[in-house]
Amino acid sequence: MDQSTHLTWRFLFTGQSPVNFWRQWQDFDLDNNLAVSLQATTRDLQTASQALAWFFRAVVTAPSTMRKQCINAFGVSPQAGDIWIVHGDTLSTLLGSIWAKRNGGIIAHIEAGLRSKYIFRPFPEEINRRLVSRLASLHFPQDEVARLNLVSQSVKGDVIPTHGNTLYDALEVLRDSNWGEPLPDSPFVVANIHRNENLSSTDRWECILETLCLAAQEQPVYLVMHPPTELKLKMDSAAHQRLAKAGVITLPRVTFRRFIQLINKSRYVISDGGSNQEECAYLGKPCLILREESERVEGLNESCLLSKFIPEKIHQFLASPESYARSKTIFSKTPSSIVVGGLQDAYAKRGTA
């Protein structure tokens, strides 16, 4: 939020993905003095065991230790009644909510209300969502389905629909950015595969490999590597060789700014990520979603095709990806402006705005 909102903010970083976090922070030219890492980590987590060890170290951090770190970084410490903003459904979302409760904070959850039908799928995201909804008292669902999920759960506090994801505002900020090495003029495809349920399933992994190889028959496919995917291909050298032989080019994980440039210039996107689904929906970019189900409604049956790993659907998309192209989304009132308004109202009710 900018200075015109009259809300003072600080960013507490959990340490889950330090490399990627600071890259994104720099993408938006944010002041490093406004962020502090509460867990000393130097690399993005790759394995479930690493994530588990990090989470339990972080969750037992004493409030007094956290307050001391904040005073050293910002000159102030968390106060009872402060609003703590958490976003999404990661372990960091849950961790931030726990920290907020321990410090007497009010939890505002952005991207609230997303639900699957299964508590362990996706794991641990679905569990994180449900727990955070019980802890939060300000809920910002991005669509009507998410809002109704919160209503049916009888969550406490205010439910404030944003009618879209705040990711839209991030895309708008970077819309005209021109940064980095020039991109190819010839057609190419961007792929982004990283979900645990896909990397750990033999059948799904084979379907993903086959899909990427089929796409590469017509144009180069740039597979952007997440830490879990990189580890998977190191362990499965035959798959790595198969992709390389087919014309799939692996790229080191790039910054958010660069990734959006790649999406914008690409012919289409292949992904198993919910955020990528939203990005493509807002940009009007064709996207083949390699998942069984998606909790998000953005772009479905429009620019985004949910494959459910059905070969006929995958072939249908690959045969005519341009038929899924749509116009870019335009909001009259952006999701982030709605969130900021909700925060201002919450502070006003508290008597401190």
Regions found by a protein language model. Name each.
Residues 1-221, 229-353:
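Nucleotide-activated sugar donor-binding and catalytic core shared by glycosyltransferases
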Residues 226:
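Conserved C-terminal portion of the radical SAM core fold
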